[in-house]
């Protein structure tokens, strides 16, 4: 007979957990026979005593198997089922371009995304800015969209990795979110439940990253690569910069417009392009759709320049209930803020540093994110034309623009952004891409 308290005692005493015990514990989490207090005690024991790679693999697979696991074989797809996941940040709109780009190159991308968390924007919130777009279709509609279009971006359902949903909710209120072992299992259980052949992980580094230090970001990346591969899914990770907003804008409708501009060739900001291409190229190599990164980049640029990637995005939007002419007339459908004001620089100088987390929180304060789960989002608000590290700005020239619902909210955001920028005599832009793991 399985006794949760004895299982918890093992980890408390730094003893190894076996696969059967982990599976039994996760089954108890799912059926409710393991109490909230026992989940909390287990999470704290793991936080202090950690899990080995084998234990992490076992926990990940048990959480995957706690609900539905999508199987794409019956659809007889003619390409690999692959995806990208990001630890999140500010202005990280990569998913909206990467999915269609990879689909246009022969991949199938069933991307299950999340809402905003803390200062980070959520891909699901961005897509919800598109009128009519259904982020929670039923499984059949999701599978049809992936089969017919090659990409569908939706939200997590209660039937995918339900044990993880319960464990995460308890970790969130028991000061155990920061456990690399449990973050790894949380991310990968959902990705494995989506039936992926391969995954590329985008792990952010810097002031707007989820992990506070570069060392911790690298530790998380290594854990995800080791556990993903240990669970039978080809997995690599790329460490990318989040010391400033990735796109020159932040905010839901504004980022959708940015993604459309990128796909149609109207504007491809350099740092955003570098990260999007690096992740997309690695995904093509992972899925066997390109011989090497150079071959992958050539295929991706062809997909962009021919309009094939933009066409996949348009088809995905239509397949999931959005407007058929969004690519051609985004301004007709995307909400626009009532107030748009510049953020004047308080002095002349070169941007040396940006508090990226503060930029994200400024968007949340404008109404573009949530402080409580039940909060409604104002999709129109955000920031645009943000100055980059290494860029020279003259006094009273704009560091960016605030899009707000009213003048009071705009004034508060202007002050926050001015305080988020540090200007000096000189400043060098940080690398966009730090390293690849796996």
UniProtKB/Swiss-Prot annotation:
It catalyses: thymidine + phosphate = 2-deoxy-alpha-D-ribose 1-phosphate + thymine. One of its GO terms (cellular component) is cytosol. Keywords: Glycosyltransferase, Transferase. One of its GO terms (molecular function) is thymidine phosphorylase activity. InterPro entries: Glycosyl_Trfase_fam3, Glycosyl_Trfase_fam3_N_dom, Glycosyl_Trfase_fam3_N_dom_sf, Nuc_phospho_transferase, PYNP-like_C_sf, PYNP_C, Pyrmidine_PPas_bac/euk, Pyrmidine_PPase_CS. Its EC number is 2.4.2.4. Gene3D superfamilies: Nucleoside phosphorylase/phosphoribosyltransferase catalytic domain, Pyrimidine nucleoside phosphorylase-like, C-terminal domain, Transferase, Pyrimidine Nucleoside Phosphorylase, Chain C. Pfam families: Glycos_trans_3N, Glycos_transf_3, PYNP_C. Pathway: Pyrimidine metabolism; dTMP biosynthesis via salvage pathway; dTMP from thymine: step 1/2. One of its GO terms (biological process) is pyrimidine nucleobase metabolic process. It is an enzyme of class 2 (transferase). Homodimer. Belongs to the thymidine/pyrimidine-nucleoside phosphorylase family. The enzymes which catalyze the reversible phosphorolysis of pyrimidine nucleosides are involved in the degradation of these compounds and in their utilization as carbon and energy sources, or in the rescue of pyrimidine bases for nucleotide synthesis. This is Thymidine phosphorylase. It comes from Burkholderia lata (strain ATCC 17760 / DSM 23089 / LMG 22485 / NCIMB 9086 / R18194 / 383).
